[in-house]
Each structure stands twice: as C-alpha cells, then as structure tokens.
Amino acid sequence: GSVFNCGETCVLGTCYTPGCTCNTYRVCTKD
C-alpha cells in the first residue's frame, strides 16, 4: 500500500509482523 515501517528489523530476511516484508535495507515494511 503506502510504505509503512513495521518497526522490525529482518537481518535473517524474515518479518514476524503479519503482512510485512523485508526490504533491501533489512527493515520490515508493509505494502
């Protein structure tokens, strides 16, 4: 959607917050 910072880092490439994905900056964002 609009990029929303989930407040979660994803060093291992996994986001635990529902609907969030790991971007190239290793930060979880929601679409």
From Swiss-Prot:
Which top-rank group of organisms is this from?
Eukaryota
Tell me if Transferase is a UniProt keyword of this record. Answer: no
* A GO biological process held by the record: defense response
Key words, A-Z = Disulfide bond, Knottin, Plant defense
> Would the keyword Disulfide bond turn up in this protein's UniProt record?
yes
PROSITE patterns registered for this protein in UniProt: CYCLOTIDE_MOEBIUS
Q: Cross-referenced InterPro entries, in alphabetical order?
A: Cyclotide, Cyclotide_moebius_CS, Cyclotide_sf
PTM text: This peptide occurs in both cyclic and linear forms.
Q: Where is this cross-link: Cyclopeptide (Gly-Asp)?
A: G1-D31
What does it do? Probably participates in a plant defense mechanism.
Please state which protein family the record places this protein in.
Answer: Belongs to the cyclotide family. Bracelet subfamily.
Which comment does the entry carry about domains? The presence of a 'disulfide through disulfide knot' structurally defines this protein as a knottin.
Protein known as: Kalata-B9
Origin species: Oldenlandia affinis
